[in-house]
């Protein structure tokens, strides 16, 4: 399991298991949604979709 550190929109440090992310999407205004399979299992971060995707892909490749 490879954890990726993000800061959520509330300024809290959040660690995400890159293997468990179902999808990411642009939420507007530089915010990105990371979804893990349900409405309650969603994290919003102040990063572009490209930056989030890069961090998650890097974690997946660096196994």
Task: List each model region and its residues.
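Eukaryotic intrinsically disordered, low-complexity regulatory linkers and tails enriched in Ser/Thr/Pro
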Residues: 1-63
């Amino acid at each position: 399991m490879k954890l990726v550190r993000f800061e959520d929109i509330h300024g809290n440090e959040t660690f995400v298991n890159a293997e468990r992310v179902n999808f990411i999407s642009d939420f507007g205004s530089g915010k990105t949604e990371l979804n893990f399979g349900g409405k309650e299992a969603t994290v919003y971060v102040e990063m572009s979709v490209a930056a989030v995707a890069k961090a998650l892909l890097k974690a997946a490749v660096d196994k």
